[in-house]
Amino acid sequence: MSLPTVIVLASGRGERFAASGGSTHKLQARLAGKTVLQHTLDAVRASGLPWHLEDGGHPGMGDSIAAAVRTTLLSTPQATGWLILPGDLPLIQSDTLRAVAAALNGHDVAMPIYRGQRGHPVGFSARCGLALLNLKGNQGAALVVRSYTAIELIVNDVGCVTDIDTVDDLRTAERLMHGACGSG
């Protein structure tokens, strides 16, 4: 049985990070000796799931998701689904990726929940493919999530809700990596 593909979104401009004092694009910012994006990709690789990096510079998140789904369908026409993961979640755990992927076996949409907060990746079954292909502009996949029955997975992974939008977010991630704030 084929596995869903993790789509790592890396097309955004990162304007809030620059506005907060960042001297580089947020995905290239250093965190514990590696870039933010490298940490995210390390977790994706460790999950064992197939993946695709979408860094094509599309005008909006919807365009990026649609382009990535289109690309993965060309290489895997019988795709079982997709996990949409922003590239700025450097603390995401590979176990969370696998849990969301497994939940797609019986559900159209699956998303992790950490302490009551919805996180990423959001998983979509193949039934959602056409809706994802039709996304455009700055709107992400929230409308698709609302159009299907979703399962919420309770996870012990602060990384699914720890994105890097500002320099302060980067500092918070650094503290979390070193256990100063705790994650459980």
Where does each model-flagged region fall?
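Short, solvent-exposed polar/charged micro-motifs at secondary-structure junctions
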Residues: 62, 121, 161-165
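Conserved alpha/beta core of the MobA/IspD/sugar-nucleotide pyrophosphorylase nucleotidyltransferase superfamily
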Residues: 2-6, 134-184
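Short aromatic/basic micro-patch
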Residues: 30, 91, 123, 163-164
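Nucleotide and nucleotide-moiety/phosphate-recognizing core
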Residues: 2-118, 149-157, 181
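Active-site-adjacent beta-strand anchor residues
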Residues: 54-55, 85-86, 122, 135, ...
